[in-house]
Amino acid sequence: MAWLGNDCAETIALRADIDAVTFDDAPHHRCGHDYHTASLLGAMAYLKDHQQELRYNVAFIFQCAEENTSGAKALVQHGLWERFPQRPSAIFGIHNRPELPVGVIGVHQGALMAEKTDFRVVFHGQQGHSSTPEKCIDPILPAAQFALELSNLVSHETSPFDTAVCSVYSFHSGTEDNAAPLHATLTGTIRTLRHGTHQHLKERLSDLAQAMALAHRCTVEELSWMHDVPLLDNSAALYPRAYAAAAAAVGEEHVTDVAPCLGGEDFAVYMQDVPGFFYWVGSGKGGDAPVSPWHSDGFAVEDGYLGTAISLLTKLIL
């Protein structure tokens, strides 16, 4: 964290995430957070050189652990806002976007990124040999049925006009080919753009797990929720300021309204305390060039990204 002041009446926070992702069992910057860090450092250096021109004091936040969505929560819990001489009245953040060409900035008023919750469900059965199934309670059956039925929660219990994802992405059970295991463990995620929908899906997921266990004589040994991230809802009050800064940085013709997505971003945690706005900053080649997404081995940030990002961040302050 850092602070730059000019005795201004208001303080604005700027945040960059700094962590890498694990790829082939080693840390790599396959999501561009190194560029986010460099952007904020560049903005800090420029603003320091123009300190007497500041319209706002600036709180700089360099945040770890965005990828596992725990970093922002940890900073807030450890008194982030109290560490600055003046509490910020707003916070702004950026993330590169390979689908947008360099020189384009994506903005959106309202819900931009999903509320996200990861879940873990453990079904408990009774071990036994495959030759005597009547003496076993196989936890794989209810776990598999649970995974299949989850898709029905979205298709049959949410409005077709309401965006939601509810999916299983890992399934682990057993080590032998001739014995019923004791446990079957599933993990997955719920992502929505409305809090009410999110709460409904969590309740129904719990109901479904218990029903599948009962139908197959198992028990639900564990149902836990992990890595909750709130809805990232860009402030309507900040939108004019955010749009003006983007237009000043790249020209109004290069500012585009973007659709919401179901990715999770723990920048939303800060927005529980202060109004916030989050941008997409183009990092792709544009045109007909293939897009290498985040977390892929072909991911790269194109030249010119840093200039756009630094300009945007400084325009928010000067």
List each model region and its residues.
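A non-catalytic alpha/beta surface segment that caps or lines the substrate-entry region
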Residues: M1-N6
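Short strand->helix junction
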Residues: D7, V21, A65, H195, ...
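Short, charged/polar, Gly/Pro-enriched secondary-structure boundary elements
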Residues: D7-A13
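Non-cysteine beta-strand/loop elements that form the S-adenosyl-L-methionine
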Residues: A13-R15, H95, F119, F278-S283
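Short glycine-centered, acidic/aromatic-flanked micro-motifs in structured strand/loop junctions
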Residues: A16, F62-C64, I190-T192
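Histidine/acidic-residue-rich, glycine-tolerant segments that coordinate divalent metal ions
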Residues: A20-R30, D34-Y35, L40, L47, ...
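Metal-dependent amide/peptide-bond hydrolase catalytic core
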Residues: A144-L318
